[in-house]
Amino acid sequence: MLMPKRVKYRREHRGKMRGRAKGGTEVHFGEYGIQAQESSWITNRQIEAARIAMTRYMKRGGKVWIKIFPSKPYTAKPLEVRMGSGKGAPEGWVAVVKPGKVLFEISGVSEEVAREALRLASHKLPIKTKFVKREEIGGESNES
C-alpha cells in the first residue's frame, strides 16, 4: 500500500479541487497511459487495485509507472459518535487528482494489450479516464 513514510502534520484540511492539473499531463516514461477527466480523491487502495488489475492482465510483461502518490491523510470518526469533540483519527491516504493528470503509464506491450489493461484499471477508479499515447515530436519520441 502506498503512503508517506512520515508527515509533518497528522491531520489536514480537505482543500478545494478547482481547475486542471498543473503538471504530469503528458506521457513521459511509458508509451501509453490513462488520463483523468474529472477531479477526485483516489485512495491508496484504489491505486493498488488498479495496479494489480493491470499487471495481472499483462502477465508480468511490460513495465508500469504509477504517476500519482497518496500524500494526503483523511480522517473519520467512529460510528455512532456525537458531533464535536475534535477531528477524527486518520483513516487512510488519498491522492488529489485533477482533470488532465496522467495516472498510470505502461510500456513494453502492444497497444491492444495496453488498452485492455488500462481499461481494467480504470474500472477500479472512481473517475472517468481517457486512454492516451505518447506524443512524438518531429518523428522522434520525446526521450532525453
Curated annotation (Swiss-Prot):
What domain of life does the UniProt record list for this protein's source?
A: Bacteria
Identify one Pfam family in the record.
Answer: Ribosomal_L16
Q: Does the keyword Ribosomal protein apply?
A: yes
Q: Does the keyword rRNA-binding apply?
A: yes
Q: Name one GO biological process term.
A: translation
Gene Ontology cellular-component annotations: cytosolic large ribosomal subunit
Q: Which Gene3D superfamilies match?
A: Ribosomal protein L10e/L16
Q: Which residues form a coiled coil?
A: none
Q: Which GO terms describe its molecular function?
A: rRNA binding; structural constituent of ribosome; tRNA binding
CDD domains to which the protein is assigned, alphabetical: Ribosomal_L16_L10e (cd01433)
Keywords from the named record: Ribonucleoprotein, Ribosomal protein, RNA-binding, rRNA-binding, tRNA-binding
Q: Which family does it belong to?
A: Belongs to the universal ribosomal protein uL16 family.
**What is the stated purpose of this protein?**
Binds 23S rRNA and is also seen to make contacts with the A and possibly P site tRNAs.
Which NCBIfam families does UniProt cross-reference here?
rplP_bact
Complex formation: Part of the 50S ribosomal subunit.
Protein name in UniProt: Large ribosomal subunit protein uL16
Specify the species: Bacillus licheniformis (strain ATCC 14580 / DSM 13 / JCM 2505 / CCUG 7422 / NBRC 12200 / NCIMB 9375 / NCTC 10341 / NRRL NRS-1264 / Gibson 46)
